[in-house]
Regions:
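Hydrophobic core
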Residues: 15-19
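C-terminal motif of bacterial Sec signal peptides marking the signal peptidase cleavage site
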Residues: 21-23
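Second-shell loop/turn segments in exported
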Residues: 43-51, 67-78, 116-121, 170-181, ...
């Protein structure tokens, strides 16, 4: 009887210990498995720009160069999705809508402009810029930080078979446009995120406007319309435009100014590049191998009105952009992070100036 009781006691102790260890392991496993999990809804929100804390420059670019957003040509679903992604991101980080309680600013296109880069598709006659703002203490002055999000397709002529009614057709090929200008949009968005956090408790001296322009590839249409519609809202403003950055290799930012109105702006920005050790070259933006300027961007829409503007763009882009070579494999994300940090640094330290 005594032996039997001892055996029962030992068995009971073993069972109790087993239950305790099982329970502890279950809790531990539960704790470990719950860490770092992203729910399906969070994944969906991230893919459409609603979850900015899960996004960075690299992941934003991965989205905007993926099949859902590929080429981002004016008038296509990919362009519309890109606009929605940016709007969702602006809203989620706490920017205020700029245009009568809306982040959208409508831009109308004529038929000829709509058909240039996608001749086989019928497109709507309007697109949207996406505009958000951090309101400043003095809303009669502003800095406009901009980047365009539309891109192009490659057009190829394809001969039809002999029995076809048409002998020639244009084949449209979509390309990523990583350098031009998913890079600029990613830096724009992440700069906006950093600055909304920085100015969470105290307003900047003047408005900081974040503008994602559309239809740049059709002739600076989105930015031109923005300047036309809103220039009179401000006594003074200036522009910093981001277009075509982040290529790996030896090319620096092209920071040679070509307009006297903009010289002070360039001088102050170069000081920050020096301080933050961002490599640049004293060459003009969008030059070819023969030093001819063969391209432009949305900063020119501001210069037409005699307002100061600066373009953050890399040298060596001619021949890469608008080709299949412009893809994510040539992107230096550390370089993009350093450019973004320098831009934020410049805006904070020159908060009291309008050029």
């Amino acid at each position: 009887m005594e032996i039997k009781n001892k055996v029962i006691s030992i068995i009971s102790s073993v069972l109790i210990l087993d239950l305790l260890f099982t329970g502890c392991n279950s809790v531990a496993n539960k704790d470990v498995s719950s860490k770092g999990i992203i729910t399906y809804q969070e994944q969906l929100d991230t893919k459409v720009g609603k979850n900015p804390e899960k996004l960075d420059i690299e992941s934003i670019m991965e989205e905007l160069t993926s099949d859902e957003y590929l080429s981002r040509v004016v008038g296509t679903d990919e362009n519309t999705r890109s606009a929605e992604f940016i709007k969702n991101y602006f809203e989620a980080i706490g920017l205020e809508p700029f245009n009568n309680d809306s982040f959208y600013h409508e831009v109308y296109l004529n038929k000829e402009m709509r058909s240039i880069f996608n001749p086989n598709e019928e497109n709507d006659n309007k697109v949207n810029n996406i505009i958000g703002v951090i309101k400043g203490k003095d809303s009669s002055k502003a800095v406009v930080i901009s980047a365009h999000f539309d891109h192009v397709t490659i057009r190829e002529k394809v001969e039809e078979s002999a029995n076809s009614s048409e002998s020639l057709q244009i084949k449209v090929k979509k390309i990523q446009g990583a350098v031009d200008n998913a890079s600029g949009i990613a830096v724009l968005l992440e700069s906006a995120k950093d600055l909304t956090k920085y100015y969470n408790k105290e307003k900047p001296e003047h408005d900081i406007i974040f503008a994602a322009f559309n239809a740049e590839e059709l002739g600076l249409i989105g930015s031109s319309k923005f300047v036309e519609d809103f220039k009179d809202n401000y006594e003074d403003w200036y522009n910093i435009n981001i277009d075509c950055i982040g290529m790996n290799g030896n090319e620096g930012l092209a920071v040679k100014n070509t307009n006297p109105v903009c010289q002070e702006l360039y001088d102050d920005f170069i000081e920050v590049l020096d301080k933050d050790k961002v490599y640049y070259e004293m060459v003009p933006y969008a030059r070819d191998e023969e030093d001819r300027i063969v391209g432009s961007s949305d900063h020119m829409s501001f210069r037409r009105g005699n307002d100061a503007s600066l373009v953050i763009g890399q040298d060596g882009i001619v021949g890469i952009v608008h080709s299949e070579e412009d893809n994510m494999s040539i992107i230096d994300f550390e370089l993009l992070d350093s450019i973004k940090d320098a831009l934020v640094d410049f805006l904070i330290n020159n908060n009291d100036k309008v050029y």
